[in-house]
């Protein structure tokens, strides 16, 4: 799981203004970090199907946020894709 310090570091890197914690960019970055963590987890725990379902749910959430951002502002979408290295 994400430690509070790591989560705060991600929020600070992607926030749009001082008190920003809920913008799509921040949410996408946090979900991406959780996806990375779970992907590493599955390299050692191949039979953890319960968590794998959670991973698919998180990937779907991130996909929805990315679709929303693409529809709302294409430049911000391209920026976050490039910054996080998400293939799309």
From Swiss-Prot:
Keywords, A to Z? Ribonucleoprotein, Ribosomal protein, RNA-binding, rRNA-binding
Q: Which GO terms describe its cellular component?
A: cytosolic small ribosomal subunit
Q: Check the record and name the SUPFAM superfamilies matching this protein.
A: S15/NS1 RNA-binding domain
UniProt-listed Pfam families: Ribosomal_S15
Q: Name one GO biological process term.
A: translation
- InterPro entries per record: Ribosomal_uS15, Ribosomal_uS15_bac-type, uS15_NS1_RNA-bd_sf
**UniProt KW Hydrolase keyword:** no
GO molecular function: any one? structural constituent of ribosome
Q: Which domain of life is it from?
A: Bacteria
Q: Its quaternary structure?
A: Part of the 30S ribosomal subunit. Forms a bridge to the 50S subunit in the 70S ribosome, contacting the 23S rRNA.
What role is this protein assigned? One of the primary rRNA binding proteins, it binds directly to 16S rRNA where it helps nucleate assembly of the platform of the 30S subunit by binding and bridging several RNA helices of the 16S rRNA.
Q: Which family does it belong to?
A: Belongs to the universal ribosomal protein uS15 family.
* Protein name in UniProt: Small ribosomal subunit protein uS15
Instruction: Name the source organism.
Output: Citrifermentans bemidjiense (strain ATCC BAA-1014 / DSM 16622 / JCM 12645 / Bem)
């Amino acid at each position: 799981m994400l430690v509070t310090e790591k989560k705060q570091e991600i929020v600070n890197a992607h926030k749009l203004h001082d008190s920003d914690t809920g913008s799509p960019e921040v949410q996408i970055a946090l979900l991406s970090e959780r996806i990375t963590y779970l992907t590493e987890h599955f390299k050692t725990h191949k039979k953890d199907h319960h968590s794998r379902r959670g991973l698919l749910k998180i990937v779907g959430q991130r996909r929805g946020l990315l679709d929303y951002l693409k529809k709302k502002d294409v430049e911000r979408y391209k920026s976050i894709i490039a910054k996080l290295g998400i293939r799309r």
